[in-house]
């Protein structure tokens, strides 16, 4: 019975280590936040749970036009900051009033891509 307990504890520890090692990257925080109503931001920050691989990660911003069509916002620079955990898009031109959609793709050291999107409004 003691041997079964030891074997069970070892298996549980191995499963825990495996699940931690295989945890995928996740979005922790966004600025502006989803569904926020804000004035024109100078940048958009997406904070992730671990370091990103820049060449495989991206952030795109679109304005939603009348009728629902999305038009990509040009003239933004995307970089990694905060020890590679934050994907920042710096906006070179002020954004006008409207609804904006952020689409992102994040890849961590495990090379597994995670994607997402959210919207915010500028009044």
Task: Indicate where each model-derived feature is located.
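Absolute protein N-terminus
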Residues: 1, 22-24, 123
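Residues at the start of alpha-helices and the adjacent loop-to-helix junctions
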Residues: 13-15, 24
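Acidic, low-complexity Ser/Thr/Gly/Pro-rich repeat segments typical of extracellular/periplasmic
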Residues: 36, 50-121
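N-terminal non-catalytic regions of secreted/periplasmic and cell-surface proteins
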Residues: 22-60
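N-terminal signal peptide c-region/cleavage motif recognized by signal peptidases
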Residues: 18-20
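Bacterial N-terminal signal peptides that target proteins for export
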Residues: 1-9, 13
């Amino acid at each position: 019975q003691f041997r079964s307990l030891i074997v069970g504890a070892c298996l549980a520890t191995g499963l825990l280590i495996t699940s931690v090692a295989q945890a995928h990257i996740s979005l922790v925080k966004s600025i502006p936040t989803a569904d926020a109503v804000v004035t024109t931001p100078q940048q958009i920050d997406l904070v992730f749970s671990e370091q990103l691989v820049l060449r495989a990660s991206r952030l795109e911003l679109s304005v939603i036009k009348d009728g629902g069509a999305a038009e990509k916002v040009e003239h933004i620079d995307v970089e990694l900051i905060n020890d590679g955990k934050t994907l920042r898009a710096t906006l070179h031109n002020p954004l006008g009033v409207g609804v904006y959609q952020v689409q992102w793709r994040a890849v961590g050291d495990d090379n597994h891509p995670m994607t997402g999107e959210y919207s915010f409004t500028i009044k």
